[in-house]
C-alpha cells in the first residue's frame, strides 16, 4: 500500500502567518506556568498504534505543514529578564531531526509489546530540553499484538491540554473511507427545556436549580479548602507518598468494547462517563480487596471474601474540559480545518470526585453510585472555580501556591476520540492511547474512545502500584460482570 501525504482541507482563506500570531513574545499563561512546577511538571504521552509500517520521511514532510504551523510547536520558552524571569514564548527555527526520533529496534527482543512498554517507561525518566520547542515524536516500526507500528508523541503540558491536543491530532487525520474529509467527534446534545410547563412552577424550578448549583459549589469550595489543608485520602496500597511526581512511570493500556459500555449505559440510563467511573470503582475495589487479603495473609491473619477496611476515602482529581463549544458542535470541521486554526492551551478545571470502594452484592450499584455522584458534580461550578483559583494564585502569589492536590489517590480523565477509522499522514490508525507522567499521584486512569473501542490507559509509579496489568484485568472483568448482570436482569431492549 502506498503512503501519501495528507490532503489539505480547502478553506476560504489561509491561516494567519506566525508573524501575526499573538503567541510570540507573550508570557506563558498562568496554567502553562503551573505545569513547570516541580510537583506538576507534567508531560502528555500519546501512544498511537498504526495498521501499517511508518514512513519517517512522509511524516516529517507533513509535520512542516501541520505541527510547525502551530506557534507553540515552533516556540521555545525563555526567561524574560525584563519581567522578573517569567517564561515567555519566543519563535525558534525548528530542526525536525531534534524532534523526530527513529530508533533501531533490538532484533533479538523477546517481546515487542514489552519493548514498546519499556521504551515509553524510559521516556518518563527524561525531560525535553527547554532550548527547543517542548515536544518530540518517536517512530517505532515494531509489530506488536495490536499494531504494525507505534508512534509516541510527547508534549509538555504547558503547550496544551488533552482536549486541544486531540483537536490538533484530528486536524492531521482524514477519514479512512473518505480521504478528503475530516473525522467527527461524539458530542453531547443538551436536552431542551420542556416548554409545556410554564408560569410560576417553571420559574420556581429554575430558581431552585440555580440555588442548588450555588449551594453545591459552596459545599465543594469548602471541601476543596479542607482537602488542601488537612483532609487526605486513606493510606491504601494505591496512594502514593509526597514527591511521587518525579518518579518514572509504567504505562500500559487495554482495549474494551465501546459497544458493551454503551449497552450498560443505555440499560442504566447513564452516560459513558458514568459507566467508566462505575467499572473503575468496581475494579479498584477488587484490586484493593486482593491487596488487603495478601496483607492479612502475610501477617498470618485469616483471609475472607471481603478484606477491605471500612470507610475507605478514595478520591480522584477528575479533570473537566471547560471549552463549551466542544460539547455543542457535531461538526468540528470549522475548529480543526487546519492545524494552525486549532487553539492550544490549558482550559481545564478539576473536581474532587469521590469513589465508593467496597464489594457490592449487586454490581449495578457501582453504576448507580457513579451516576448519582456524576449528576451531583454536574450541578456545581467546582471545575470553573478550581481553574479560576489556580489562575488567581499564580498571578498574585506565584505558581508554587497553586499546585494540583496531592491528597487524592489518582488522576482520572477521559477524552472522546474519532468516531470513524482515520488515517494520520496516510497511515491507518489502529488506536490512540493518551496519558501523562509527572503528576503528583501514583496512579492515573485515562479513557479515550476510537470507533467501537474504548482504550483504557494506566500510568503508575511501579514503586507504589507494581501491578498495572492486573488493574487492566480488573477493569476488563468488571465491565464483563456488569454487562452480564444487565443482560441477566433483562434490562436490555
Predicted regions and their residues:
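Soluble acyl-CoA-dependent acyltransferase catalytic core bearing the H(X)4D motif
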Residues: 2-26, 36, 45-441, 445-476, ...
Amino acid at each position: 500500500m502506498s503512503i501519501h501525504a495528507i490532503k489539505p482541507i480547502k478553506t476560504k482563506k489561509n491561516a494567519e502567518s506566525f508573524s501575526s500570531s499573538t503567541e510570540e513574545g507573550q508570557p506563558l499563561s498562568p496554567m502553562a506556568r503551573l505545569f513547570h512546577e516541580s510537583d506538576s511538571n507534567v508531560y502528555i504521552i500519546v501512544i498511537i498504534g498504526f495498521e501499517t509500517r511508518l514512513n519517517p520521511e512522509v511524516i516529517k514532510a507533513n509535520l512542516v505543514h501541520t505541527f510547525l504551523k502551530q506557534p507553540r510547536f515552533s516556540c521555545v520558552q525563555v526567561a524574560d529578564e525584563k519581567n522578573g524571569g517569567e517564561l515567555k514564548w519566543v519563535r525558534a527555527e525548528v530542526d525536525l531531526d531534534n524532534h523526530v526520533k527513529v530508533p533501531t529496534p533490538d532484533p533479538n527482543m523477546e517481546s515487542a509489546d514489552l519493548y514498546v512498554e519499556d521504551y515509553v517507561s524510559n521516556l518518563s525518566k527524561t525531560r525535553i530540553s527547554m532550548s527547543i520547542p517542548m515536544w518530540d515524536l518517536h517512530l517505532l516500526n515494531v509489530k506488536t499484538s495490536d499494531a504494525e507500528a507505534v508512534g509516541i508523541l510527547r508534549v509538555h503540558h504547558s503547550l496544551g491540554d488533552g482536549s486541544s491536543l486531540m483537536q490538533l491530532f484530528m486536524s492531521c487525520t482524514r477519514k479512512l473511507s473518505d480521504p478528503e474529509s475530516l473525522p467527527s467527534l461524539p458530542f453531547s446534545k443538551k436536552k431542551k427545556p420542556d416548554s409545556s410547563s410554564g408560569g410560576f412552577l417553571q420559574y420556581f424550578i429554575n430558581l431552585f436549580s440555580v440555588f442548588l448549583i450555588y449551594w453545591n459549589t459552596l459545599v465543594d469550595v469548602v471541601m476543596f479548602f479542607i482537602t488542601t489543608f488537612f483532609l487526605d485520602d486513606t493510606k491504601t496500597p494505591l496512594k502514593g507518598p509526597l514527591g511521587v511526581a518525579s518518579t518514572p512511570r509504567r504505562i500500559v493500556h487495554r482495549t474494551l468494547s465501546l459497544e458493551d459500555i454503551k449497552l450498560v449505559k443505555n440499560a442504566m440510563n447513564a452516560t459513558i462517563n458514568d459507566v467508566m467511573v462505575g467499572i473503575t470503582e468496581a475494579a479498584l475495589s477488587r484490586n484493593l480487596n486482593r491487596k488487603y487479603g495478601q496483607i492479612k495473609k502475610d501477617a498470618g491473619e485469616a483471609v475472607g471474601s471481603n478484606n477491605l477496611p471500612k470507610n475507605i476515602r478514595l478520591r480522584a482529581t477528575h479533570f473537566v474540559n471547560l471549552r463549551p463549544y466542544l460539547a455543542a458542535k457535531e461538526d468540528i470541521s470549522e475548529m480543526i480545518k487546519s492545524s494552525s486554526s486549532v487553539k492550544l492551551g490549558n482550559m481545564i478545571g478539576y473536581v474532587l470526585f469521590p469513589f465508593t470502594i467496597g464489594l457490592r452484592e449487586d454490581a449495578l450499584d457501582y453504576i448507580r453510585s457513579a451516576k448519582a455522584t456524576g449528576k451531583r458534580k454536574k450541578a456545581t461550578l467546582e471545575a470553573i472555580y478550581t481553574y479560576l483559583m489556580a489562575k488567581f494564585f499564580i498571578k498574585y502569589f506565584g505558581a508554587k501556591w497553586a499546585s494540583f492536590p496531592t491528597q487524592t489517590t489518582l488522576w482520572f480523565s477521559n477524552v472522546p476520540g474519532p468516531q470513524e477509522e482515520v488515517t494520520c499522514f496516510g497511515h491507518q490508525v489502529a488506536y490512540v492511547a493518551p496519558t501523562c507522567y509527572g503528576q503528583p499521584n501514583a496512579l492515573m486512569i485515562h479513557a479515550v474512545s476510537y470507533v467501537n473501542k474504548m482504550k483504557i490507559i494506566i500510568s503508575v509509579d511501579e514503586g507504589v502500584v507494581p501491578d498495572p496489568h492486573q488493574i487492566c484485568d480488573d477493569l476488563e472483568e468488571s465491565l464483563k460482570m456488569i454487562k452480564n448482570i444487565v443482560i441477566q436482569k433483562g434490562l436490555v431492549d
